[in-house]
Amino acid sequence: MSKLIKGIAASDGVAIAKAYLLVEPDLTFDKNEKVTDVEGEVAKFNNAIEASKVELTKIRNNAEVQLGADKAAIFDAHLLVLDDPELIQPIQDKIKNENANAASALTDVTTQFVTIFESMDNEYMKERAADIRDVSKRVLSHILGVELPNPSMIDESVVIVGNDLTPSDTAQLNKEFVQGFATNIGGRTSHSAIMSRSLEIPAIVGTKSITQEAKQGDMIIVDGLNGDVIVNPTEDELIAYQDKRERYFADKKELQKLRDADTVTVDGVHAELAANIGTPNDLPGVIENGAQGIGLYRTEFLYMGRDQMPTEEEQFEAYKEVLEAMDGKRVVVRTLDIGGDKELSYLNLPEEMNPFLGYRAIRLCLAQQDIFRPQLRALLRASVYGKLNIMFPMVATINEFREAKAILLEEKENLKNEGHDISDDIELGIMVEIPATAALADVFAKEVDFFSIGTNDLIQYTLAADRMSERVSYLYQPYNPSILRLVKQVIEASHKEGKWTGMCGEMAGDETAIPLLLGLGLDEFSMSATSILKARRQINGLSKNEMTELANRAVDCATQEEVIELVNNYVK
């Protein structure tokens, strides 16, 4: 008899295969065992650290190839944990001073760190706790000589079943054999869920009981469209889901026909669909999905996973590669956005109570021009290889933009004097992420060439709600009328001055938001490359005039719920 288990749909698609239970290894040890050879035990711990670094570096490099640099960046964070003296030194001291065995010392110290970080009302610190837990498990396995599960060794068609998949588990999945996965815990924003979408593997998380309900070798259906897992389906259910899977793949194939199509509404209004990228390694997906440009090139990934700043020459080569590959299509490059949830070990940034509102992005770059100027020089030199736009992140005041522009113009003059060719067709813009910037959009619009609305931060700053906090996640409301009014204000201010506005947050690729944004007059929608074809099909079926009427009604609503109901009634 079949069994239906409900979970959270994390990644689209339908998978049908036998269950492969990811069994947790036995990492038990005698916590009270004391050692006499202290130096030998410290050496055992140090060797486990080095072995973990080797493994994680391989996993990180594989993840960059399969998933792109932005998804691989989590392993840069894991490698930083293994180099953190504030974590490593107390473990070594515990072995030396208390004769603790390496496994016990590691577990005691990392548990303390995890407890402290998890209690903080700061999402970056909570994510760091998860990193420490994952890394600690890997180091412990080397101390004990126990192998961790290795999904990369799977060589038959399976659906993986487990309590949870760590980022390193997910990064090692082979798409040829792993048809999908289902876990007890997790949510749509967990690392494994995000990676499953990049791999385009159907996934269900948060089932609570899948490891109790499924046995090794059971037939499993994962319906990533509805959040259903079926264990040991009946013959009729198998036939029905095989048909559903075929229809899903047929739809994906149909979408591919739109790869080279225009994005134009039924009443003839054009929109631009661009892609977000982290490094040149992301370019194949951009081209395969028919992006009309790059609306966000996150340059911070060039700075991560290394122990020193990238040189001007290294940056120049990366920017040049992207501009040449896009063959004259617009490439919007965001200057370094470090701080907040992104750290660089070699910068020694100060610890802050609230790093998201602190020393980050343009604030850091203006203060540390030895970082900022080489990046601007590299961008200016690369500008002759394509259509380059530059935007500054986290701009709060017009003076910040003016100062950043002045530095850029100064470096442009320096480069010309050095004999370099520089394009005279570079547009300069800003990210609109701060409510104050949106409120003064009319002032900024007189001086910038374009706006790019970063909705991820704009929403949480406007509603004072951390989008990663479960307790206040109900307040993270993309369709709240206050957000729509700010977006409208920014777009109208830019159009009044003959400028354009794009959007590069998650909202830009959201099927509920797209009709509203189209109606508000958004010029460019920048999203993950895998969302582009669906968005193109959606926009090509909408009327701009009708969506304008919809948007005008939406900004007059009182609640997000009213807006969603309005959209659902308009767009059926």
UniProtKB/Swiss-Prot annotation:
Its EC number is 2.7.3.9
Q: What is this protein called?
A: Phosphoenolpyruvate-protein phosphotransferase
The question of whether Magnesium is a record keyword is answered with: yes
Q: Name one Pfam family in it.
A: PEP-utilisers_N
The domain comment in this protein's record states: The N-terminal domain contains the HPr binding site, the central domain the pyrophosphate/phosphate carrier histidine, and the C-terminal domain the pyruvate binding site.
Q: Where is the active site?
A: 191 (tele-phosphohistidine intermediate), 504 (proton donor)
Q: Name one GO biological process term.
A: phosphoenolpyruvate-dependent sugar phosphotransferase system
Catalytic activity annotated for this protein? L-histidyl-[protein] + phosphoenolpyruvate = N(pros)-phospho-L-histidyl-[protein] + pyruvate
What the entry lists under PROSITE patterns is as follows: PEP_ENZYMES_2, PEP_ENZYMES_PHOS_SITE
| MF term (GO), any | metal ion binding
Q: Name one GO cellular component term.
A: cytoplasm
Q: Tell me the keywords, alphabetical order.
A: Cytoplasm, Kinase, Magnesium, Metal-binding, Phosphotransferase system, Sugar transport, Transferase, Transport
**Family named by the database record:** Belongs to the PEP-utilizing enzyme family.
Name the InterPro entries for this protein: PEP-util_enz_mobile_dom (IPR008279), PEP-utilizing_PTS_enzyme (IPR050499), PEP_util_AS (IPR018274), PEP_util_C (IPR000121), PEP_util_CS (IPR023151), Phosphohistidine_dom_sf (IPR036637), PTS_EI (IPR024692), PTS_EI-like (IPR006318)
Q: Share any extra remarks.
A: The reaction takes place in three steps, mediated by a phosphocarrier histidine residue located on the surface of the central domain. The two first partial reactions are catalyzed at an active site located on the N-terminal domain, and the third partial reaction is catalyzed at an active site located on the C-terminal domain. For catalytic turnover, the central domain swivels from the concave surface of the N-terminal domain to that of the C-terminal domain.
Q: Chief location of this protein?
A: cytoplasm
What's this chain's function?
General (non sugar-specific) component of the phosphoenolpyruvate-dependent sugar phosphotransferase system (sugar PTS). This major carbohydrate active-transport system catalyzes the phosphorylation of incoming sugar substrates concomitantly with their translocation across the cell membrane. Enzyme I transfers the phosphoryl group from phosphoenolpyruvate (PEP) to the phosphoryl carrier protein (HPr).
**PANTHER family documented for this protein:** PHOSPHOENOLPYRUVATE-PROTEIN PHOSPHOTRANSFERASE (PTHR46244:SF3)
User: Which compartments is it annotated to reside in?
Assistant: Cytoplasm
What Gene3D superfamilies does the database record attribute to this sequence? Phosphoenolpyruvate-binding domains, Phosphohistidine domain, PtsI, HPr-binding domain
Its needed co-factors are: Mg(2+)
Q: What residues does Mg(2+) bind to?
A: 433, 457
Q: How does it assemble?
A: Homodimer.
User: Which positions does UniProt annotate for phosphoenolpyruvate binding?
Assistant: 298, 334, 456-457, 467
